[in-house]
Regions:
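Short, acidic, metal-binding catalytic loop of nucleotide-sugar glycosyltransferases
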Residues: 24-36
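A conserved acidic beta->alpha catalytic loop
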Residues: 43-54, 73
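Conserved nucleotide-sugar donor-binding catalytic segment
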Residues: 153-240
């Protein structure tokens, strides 16, 4: 008998389009070709006073398969995902599929992901390429995409990171490679490597998963639609927290990558010399990424003053210990 597996959605309604985006997301889950799904929506203390009533109405549509949890205070989408993952564990789900509230899953997403996990029991994380849509659900042409998104798509089409050491190429070559709404993880893996940070929490978690020995698998067909409203600069997170996003992103990436090198070194997968070279290459790649996103002062700091990068990494390591 096929078990139910769980779509995990953090929800924070803080703009006028949130209700429509949420409904479109839920409809995409209800349209899955594989009927063995559950959906857990974790509301992050949305400022929209109508959000609670709206979510309860969605749950009432299919209370056996759709559940909503309401956080008593705003904790960030990473913590909300952790709450959803723990709920999935309690009902015995083998894996979770992350799906942000403004993104859309293809109808065959669950079917394709289940097939990948069954095909290779060693795989712990599955991700795919994606289609970019605007606020109206219309596909965004490539020339209108920001450089960071184009870089992700280029890296995927050339040679998407996969296998047991995906963290190395993600950190030193491609940068962020798997959008959260395209990513599915075995529940046990998601429990072992929870989301920690408020910014770039997904990137940080993927580094730790891969560095901890989790095998990544990549599906070349798009399984999700990633929404970028045309009148909002950057992601919803970036619009909300402003320029501090880039500093937080830098710290989260450094923390995740150095955690991966520490774990790989501890397992004997790499020696200290290779670890130092990987860390150097990581800072060079991070500088390029920050510059592409317009964070030029941070990019200069990372690239031209290597000691700052080392100091940042050392401070992050101290904070973790």
């Amino acid at each position: 008998m096929t078990q139910d597996d769980v779509f995990v959605t953090p929800h924070y309604a803080d703009h006028r389009r949130a209700a429509g985006f949420l409904n479109e997301m839920v409809r995409s889950i209800e349209a899955q070709t594989d009927p063995h799904w559950r959906l857990i929506i974790v509301d992050d203390k949305s400022p929209d006073p109508s959000a609670v009533e709206r979510l309860r109405a969605i749950q009432a549509r299919d209370p056996q398969r759709i559940q909503c949890i309401f956080m008593p205070e705003h904790v960030g989408q990473g913590v909300c995902r952790n709450v959803g993952v723990n709920w999935a564990k309690r009902i015995g789900a083998a894996f979770v599929l992350f799906n942000d509230a403004d993104d859309v899953s293809y109808p065959d997403r669950l079917e394709r992901v289940r097939s990948e996990f069954e095909r290779d029991p060693d795989v712990g994380l599955v991700y795919s390429t994606f289609e970019v849509i605007d606020e109206d659900g219309v596909q965004v042409e490539r020339h209108r995409l920001g450089e960071p998104i184009r870089q992700i798509l280029d890296a995927q089409s050339a040679n998407a990171p996969r296998g047991y050491d995906a963290w190395k190429r993600i950190g030193t070559e491609t940068g962020y490679a798997n959008l959260t709404s395209t990513t599915a993880v075995r529940t046990a893996v998601a429990i072992e490597y929870p989301f920690f940070c408020m910014t770039a929490e997904d990137s940080n978690a993927w580094y730790r998963m891969s560095g901890g020995g989790v095998k990544f698998s990549y599906v070349e067909a798009p399984l999700a639609k990633y929404r970028i409203p045309t009148d909002i600069k950057g992601s919803q997170d970036r619009a909300r927290v402003g320029e501090s996003y880039y500093f937080g992103k830098m710290i989260a990436e450094i923390a995740g990558f150095f955690a991966a090198t520490d774990m790989a070194t501890g397992r004997g997968e790499i020696d200290s010399q290779e670890a130092r070279q990987l860390e150097k290459d990581f800072f060079l790649r991070l500088s390029r990424t920050l510059r592409a996103e317009g964070a030029h002062s941070l990019a200069d700091r990372v690239s031209s003053r290597a000691s700052d990068g080392v100091e940042l990494a050392q401070n992050v390591r101290k904070a973790r210990s």
